[in-house]
């Protein structure tokens, strides 16, 4: 099989970004001790990263949209590398917080511009698969990068974890430099015109679908450990094993979602959102034993990430006049869904409904996303996305 080097370079960048985004979750106690703060305070580093993604996605895309995409992507990975180096040498909590925010500024714009580049280096009928290939780096980070960074942080120190992640940034920059076509600098964008594109009803509908799709995922994912402990009576070792299986499911779903979205974006969204609803409604029953829990986590992970490539392609299609900005904003929408999903799951727990109802709430959110897809599909027939290089 012929290797598509531009897609490989984008996947390497995605792997690094996924590693730096998720690895602090497993290192919070170590980081908290290192900068002399409480674990909840250290948890704010994760929230700050998410906020930085939402702010940085449109901001960095607009600032870099007149530059050649290769140089823009390399610049974004330079920010990533610098942010991780500064995190590794941060002398105190506030410096670490600012370093994490700096690191996050590349996230949305990289995936947004990267999606456009990925779609431009393959034939039109393979664009969704190309976008999925880039996101495969993100899913593989959950299987390999995050556990490796966590192990490194636990054994050598959390600072070494950030330094190693910075090394991934250097590898990514070199890969992008040698694999992507140079391209010329584009015209400076008309900001008002591109923002007007985002205000179209069909674009807002697509972005809202992304928020709800991500919200369904994070309603459960945020509380996966206590949910499994409550339903399955899982040990910490078993929970860790389930997180690995979820990562495997992410990779399977990402691949299937990309392949099927090449045929039909809306059809893929309908099918996997329905599967996501069904499996989350079934988890309170299936996960009562370890085997059922393992099967549930793989299927749930696959259904969850299978909607990512079609959601990204859907926004790029309905906002084809501003593909870079729209796809970057869509990454911000994923992070907004992250926050809303965590809030929805937290509301269930705070209301005393029990951890078994958390996946049910996720199914309700997925149902809202599915309803929105059906409504939008009636008004907006599928069109072919043309990504210009």
Curated annotation (Swiss-Prot):
A single MF term (Gene Ontology): transmembrane transporter activity
Tagged with keyword Cytoplasm: no
GO CC annotation, single: plasma membrane
Location of the protein in the cell: Cell inner membrane
Keywords (A to Z) from UniProt: Cell inner membrane, Cell membrane, Membrane, Transmembrane, Transmembrane helix, Transport
Ranges that cross the membrane: 7-27, 44-64, 71-91, 101-121, 131-151, 160-180, 204-224, 237-257, 267-287, 291-311, 331-351, 357-377
GO biological process terms on file: transmembrane transport
Segments on the Cytoplasmic face: 1-6, 65-70, 122-130, 181-203, 258-266, 312-330, 378-389
SUPFAM superfamilies, per the entry: MFS general substrate transporter
Stretches in topological domain Periplasmic: 28-43, 92-100, 152-159, 225-236, 288-290, 352-356
Protein's membrane topology: Multi-pass membrane protein
Pfam families in alphabetical order: MFS_1
Main location: membrane
PANTHER family: INNER MEMBRANE TRANSPORT PROTEIN YDHP, PURINE EFFLUX PUMP PBUE
Family per record: Belongs to the major facilitator superfamily.
The protein's name in its UniProt record: Inner membrane transport protein YdhP
Organism the protein comes from: Escherichia coli (strain K12)
Organism lineage: Bacteria, Pseudomonadati, Pseudomonadota, Gammaproteobacteria, Enterobacterales
């Amino acid at each position: 099989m012929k290797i598509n080097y531009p897609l490989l370079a984008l996947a390497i960048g995605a792997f690094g970004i996924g590693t730096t985004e998720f690895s602090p979750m497993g290192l919070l106690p170590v980081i908290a001790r290192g900068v002399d703060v409480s674990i909840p305070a250290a948890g704010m580093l994760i929230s700050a990263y998410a906020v930085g993604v939402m702010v940085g996605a449109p901001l960095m895309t607009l600032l870099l949209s007149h530059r050649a995409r290769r140089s823009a992507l390399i610049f974004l990975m330079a920010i990533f590398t610098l942010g991780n180096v500064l995190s590794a040498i941060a002398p105190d909590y506030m410096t670490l917080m600012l370093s994490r925010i700096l690191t996050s500024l590349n996230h949305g714009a990289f995936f947004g511009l990267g999606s456009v580049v990925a779609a431009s280096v393959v034939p039109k009928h393979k664009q969704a698969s190309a976008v999925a290939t880039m996101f495969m780096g993100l899913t593989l980070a959950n299987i390999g990068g995050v556990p490796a960074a966590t192990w490194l942080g636990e054994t050598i120190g959390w600072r070494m974890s950030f330094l190693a992640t910075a090394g991934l940034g250097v590898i990514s920059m070199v890969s992008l430099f040698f694999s992507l076509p140079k391209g010329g600098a584009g015209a400076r964008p008309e900001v008002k015109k591109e923002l007007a594109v985002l205000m179209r009803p069909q674009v807002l509908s697509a972005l809202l679908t992304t928020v709800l799709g991500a919200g369904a995922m994070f309603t459960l994912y945020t509380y996966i450990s206590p949910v499994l402990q409550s339903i399955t009576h899982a040990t910490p070792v078993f929970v860790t094993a389930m997180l690995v299986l979820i990562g495997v499911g992410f990779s399977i779903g990402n691949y299937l979602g990309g392949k099927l979205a090449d045929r039909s974006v809306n059809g893929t969204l309908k099918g996997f959102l329905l599967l996501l609803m069904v499996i989350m409604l079934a988890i309170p029953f299936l996960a009562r034993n370890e085997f059922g829990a393992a099967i549930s986590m793989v299927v749930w992970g696959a259904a969850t990430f299978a909607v990512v490539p079609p959601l990204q392609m859907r926004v790029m299609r309905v906002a084809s006049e501003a593909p870079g900005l729209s796809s970057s904003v869509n990454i911000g929408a994923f992070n907004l869904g992250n926050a809303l999903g965590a809030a929805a799951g937290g509301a269930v727990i705070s209301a005393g409904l029990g951890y078994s109802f958390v996946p049910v709430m996720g199914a309700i959110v997925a149902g809202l996303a599915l309803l929105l897809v059906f409504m939008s599909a009636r008004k907006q027939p599928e069109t072919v996305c043309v990504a210009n290089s």
